[in-house]
Amino acid sequence: MNDQIELYGANTGNTLRAAIALEEAGIAYSPRWLDLHAREQLDPAYLTLNPAGKVPTLIDHGMTPALVINQSNAIIHYAEAKAPGRLAPAQPGPERIRVIDRYFFFVTDVIAPSHAAFFLHQAGQDKAAAIIDLRVIEQLTYAESFLTDDFMAGQQFSMADISAFTIVTAFRDRLDWKQLPQLSRWFDTVESRPSIQRARAAFQNR
């Protein structure tokens, strides 16, 4: 626990991405769980930190003024910058570029469309949402081809695996795992990492 760095969140994929990044980077933090069903994310005090009323939000009180980050992917970059070499190769070169390329594949081609499908479902546009969901599953299936090494971007766990893990978790019951042996092997390996277990435990529903 570290009160200098606080992470506000809930049991969501976005929060999990941020928490895993901090855990993998070895950055001590204090989790601050918000009950979304009780609409704690709309409390006036929290809205001063995150006017959109969403999670996660990271506060680094070690900076003057305190640094506030509201985007999970920005928190991943924050963690990578504070702990060079932990979430991506520290030195410029092909290995680092591959990590960034795979990371953004999951952010832009998989996670972003899945969010669009979620909002379409909420708006009652189920047919349109289903089309996008199928596209997400196709892209996750395509990721099988990435796994020529242990992880999504090589032999080292990286930010690419963080973005991949949370979205694969969300779609795990809709994937044909028998057709995805490498993705299945990768998922089991990543899910068993202590950082994943700690990040999940930090924001489980209470």
Which role fits each region the language model picked out?
Residues 1-130:
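GST-like domain detector, emphasizing the conserved glutathione-binding G-site
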Residues 25, 49, 174-175, 194:
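Residues at alpha-helix termini
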Residues 35, 159, 203-204:
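Short, solvent-exposed turn/loop segments enriched in Gly/Ser/Thr/Pro and often Arg
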Residues 74, 182, 195:
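Residue-level recognition of oxygen-bearing side chains
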Residues 79, 105-192:
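GST-like fold's C-terminal all-alpha helical module
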Residues 186-206:
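Long hydrophobic alpha-helical segments typical of transmembrane helices together
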